[in-house]
Amino acid sequence: MDASVFPALALACAPQVHADTARALVRVESAFNPWAIGVVGGALLRQPQTRAEALATAKALRDAGWNFSVGLGQINVGNFERLGLTVESAFEPCANLAAMQTVLAECFDRASGAVSKAADQVAVRQALSCYYSGNFATGFRHGYVRKVAVAARAVPTAQPKEKV
């Protein structure tokens, strides 16, 4: 996906997540690749290049019992059912970003409640750790929170317009 179209998609599909946060999270999770698949405790030899290839790969991983995450926001297969996703819908960019919003909002709510009167930025960082790992510590230890924070500070590059 061209990163220049991402802001409009994020606004339409995950409006409760600040655009900079959504962009940074997706940059780290999938590098804006809607067909990205991350295998927990493993790796693919190469990432799928098409929707059909992504679907076939994800179904094979599921059938083999692997734990994996898919799409722009790298939604984990263990969350599909509760988020109302299927393998097919999880690769739809808007559905994936909506799921990202749900998981991140749940994590933010937990972080805000877990730390008495936590500052919003502390809660956001804890929510990012939770998004990554399901808890408030692993994302810090593995450097995930730092990666997203660095990506959030990165200035998006402008793409030159084609001359007509």
Model-derived regions: residue spans:
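Non-catalytic cell-wall polysaccharide-engagement segments
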Residues: M1-T21, A31-A36, L44, P48-G73, ...
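Flexible glycine/serine/alanine-rich "lid" or loop that lines and gates the nucleotide-sugar donor pocket
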Residues: R27
